Regions:
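N-terminal interaction/assembly modules
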Residues: 1-83, 132-139
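A short hydrophobic/aromatic micro-motif that marks alpha-helical segments and, especially, helix-coil
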Residues: 29, 103-105, 128-130
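DNA-recognition helix of helix-turn-helix
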Residues: 113-135
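Short helix-to-turn junction characteristic of helix-turn-helix DNA-binding domains
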Residues: 84, 98-102
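A short pre-motif secondary-structure segment
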Residues: 94-95
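Helix-turn-helix DNA-binding module
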Residues: 101-118
């Protein structure tokens, strides 16, 4: 696996979780808007109840998907942390800020007390080292 792709897994899973949460909020809003009609046509009331049941069922499914994604995120985060913790302190700190905290490189450089050019070199060296670690663990 490519080192950058390996490190970006956290961001992808974070985004999946964020999107699932937004979807869950949408269906929760829907369940609050769908109400049974108490007067008039009985068919209309049962249709509303069915819509409510479908929306509630979808909420339960999405909550389960979120729980699964969080579990995957925790596993991947631990795996990535185990790899980058093997780097020297500067490389570790920079990659943590870029891939875990999702800071832009310029902000990560400032947070690490590095000039931008130094951060670029440090990041490239760190990614090379991550690739070596990944390759070593695969074989």
């Amino acid at each position: 696996m490519d080192a950058v792709e390996f490190l970006k897994r956290i961001e992808k899973i974070d985004r999946i979780i964020e999107n699932k949460i937004a979807e869950l909020e949408h269906f929760r809003d829907l369940t609050q808007k769908v109400t049974a009609s108490y007067g008039g046509d009985r068919v209309q009331a049962s249709m509303s109840q069915q819509k409510m049941a479908d929306a509630v069922g979808r909420c339960v499914d999405i909550e389960r998907e979120i729980a699964d994604a969080v579990e995957t995120l925790q596993h991947d985060r631990r795996e990535i942390m185990d790899v980058i913790e093997q780097l020297d302190a500067r490389q570790y700190d920079l990659l943590f800020k870029i891939y875990v905290e999702r800071l832009p490189l310029i902000d990560a450089a400032a947070a690490c007390g590095m000039e931008y050019r130094t951060a670029i070199r440090t990041k490239n060296a760190a990614i090379d080292n991550v690739q070596r670690i990944i390759d070593k663990n695969v074989t």
